[in-house]
């Protein structure tokens, strides 16, 4: 075997995490605080649920209503994605440089054009087709079928948010701590983005089907990442690598046993498309700059920590993060192509935008590992930019969503 192709040993993962990001120490402190709250052990104490801070009661009910509507949708339901939105009309009219009169302004000050069967829209469809054709990784002739299949899968593999929200309070708190730990490990091993999002989907689906004691939450998180890596990576980490990451808390036999059990509970169903697929499609269509793409990725990872975002489809989550990023960067328009591809307009995303902004207020308590990751020069310090923007827009953060 060629030594150049040999996978680099992961001996420095635990040291890097604990010394550089200090994720391990932060997670352990969170676990101890939760476990000792009120002098009770998380295994025998059901803490009361927290109230929904930062969004109104109307938005809270809307989030639950949206989730219920997803469950009510049959898997065989076809996407409203017509041939007109993908195929070029040969008789397209020239686009006008004048702003459409059918335009409203959002509370963020961004012009939102309403869909209209006019010449500008037809010309935009032609441009969309040209952008598809320019990217060799996109098969234009199969785009409609691929999107339709992805839409069905994202509904099929959604976790049961109602069961997760009914879990004891310590489960929600420890889930956030474990996800921050997973992000730190994922960053150190330099895994694919798909592996991270799939691992959280596997973990959430497992938590929505099984009651997990606090003592095994970290083992479940590590195993979920292990399963996702086997599905997505060319060179996934080994059991020995995970033992090093877990620093002796669990041995290989425990990891393999949990892996078998989780796959059995999930019936070996791992085909969740995830937000990365939708993000890449929207990036091709909209020609987004790198700053906006990185910001959306940051928001997507932040949403992993907040359990309430598990009630969203992957495509809806991407649309929420995209609109928030466009708002912060003061993009001129809420692009018509985004509603065309995802099927979500601005008004259907308001509640989730407010929830995301609330999560971004205090990154050091909510998503320490993710903030540290995106504060590095590699990601252009995007998390610091977002934090500075929020600090100077306190009036926006005080909105009640009415």
UniProtKB/Swiss-Prot annotation:
One Gene Ontology term, aspect cellular component: nuclear envelope
Regions that span the bilayer: none
Domain of life: Eukaryota
Keywords for the protein's UniProt record, in alphabetical order: Cell cycle, Cell division, Cyclin, Meiosis
BP-aspect Gene Ontology terms: cell division; nuclear DNA replication; reciprocal meiotic recombination; regulation of meiotic cell cycle; signaling
Molecular functions per Gene Ontology: cyclin-dependent protein serine/threonine kinase regulator activity
Family assignment from sequence similarity: Belongs to the cyclin family. Cyclin AB subfamily.
Protein function: Required for pre-meiotic DNA synthesis and S phase progression. Regulates levels of meiotic intragenic recombination.
Protein name: Meiosis-specific cyclin rem1
Organism encoding this protein: Schizosaccharomyces pombe (strain 972 / ATCC 24843)
